[in-house]
């Protein structure tokens, strides 16, 4: 019987150099958010409750900006993720706008294809994502003049060309990525310094957290998104929210 136990990803240790450069990054983030709020006061920030999104939530709330903060409860979240919604609202004394899937559409999908259909093919997994994530997000953004995300270039190959401001062609509205040029340790330096609420799964080897069936812990040295849809090729590893 093998006694080998793989080492899992851990929250990075922050260096003094990274701490020293944080004030400039935080000031730039605040300026970017204020720019968006001035141009589009009713813009919506779509939070997945990831550490990147908690950083942006913290800045929005500290600055008391009028931006909407929306999130999706797909019906397949880990309990730890659901608990973070309540913790965030308590910490910042605000209400997140929580959007959920159409119950009948979600039930019909599972009746026809089964509860584990996402493992059967990329097509079925994307259909599940559409029902549980894309359609609710479309409802959330229906009247939004612009929206914001916590995406970063260094997260994955599919995000390597992100910019601060982009055009969401599918909705014909502006899309902003206010920490697009941050590195992973910049995010954790902010989270540590400002004490932002975090998902407990980060302490269990999960650097990237989605729905429970589609997320696993990541081994030390793996790409931080290796635990998302791990059974698929890296070229298909997006849910479609950010096309």
Task: Kindly give the residue locations of the regions a language model identified.
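Nucleotide-activated chemistry modules centered on ATP-dependent adenylation/adenylyltransferase
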Residues: 2-243
């Amino acid at each position: 019987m093998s006694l080998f136990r793989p080492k899992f990803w851990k929250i990075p240790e922050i260096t003094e150099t990274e701490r020293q450069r944080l004030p400039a990054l935080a000031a730039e983030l605040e300026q970017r958010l204020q720019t968006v709020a001035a141009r589009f006061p009713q813009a919506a920030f779509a939070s997945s409750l990831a550490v990147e999104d908690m950083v942006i939530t913290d800045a929005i709330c500290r600055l008391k900006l009028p931006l909407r903060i929306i999130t999706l409860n797909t019906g397949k979240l880990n309990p730890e993720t659901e608990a973070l919604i309540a913790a965030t609202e308590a910490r910042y004394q605000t209400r997140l706008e929580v959007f959920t899937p159409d119950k009948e559409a979600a039930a019909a999908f599972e009746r026809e294809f089964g509860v584990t259909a996402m493992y059967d093919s990329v097509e079925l997994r994307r259909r599940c994502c559409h029902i549980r994530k894309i359609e609710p997000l479309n409802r959330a953004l229906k009247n939004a003049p612009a929206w914001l995300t916590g995406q970063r270039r260094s997260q994955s190959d599919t995000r390597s060309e992100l910019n601060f401001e982009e055009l969401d062609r599918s909705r014909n509205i502006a899309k902003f990525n206010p920490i697009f040029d941050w590195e992973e340790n910049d995010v954790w330096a902010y989270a540590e310094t400002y004490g932002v609420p975090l998902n407990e799964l980060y302490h269990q080897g999960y650097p990237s957290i989605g729905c429970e069936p589609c997320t696993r812990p990541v081994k030390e040295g793996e790409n931080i998104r290796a635990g998302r849809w791990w059974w698929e090729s890296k070229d298909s590893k997006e849910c479609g929210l950010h096309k």
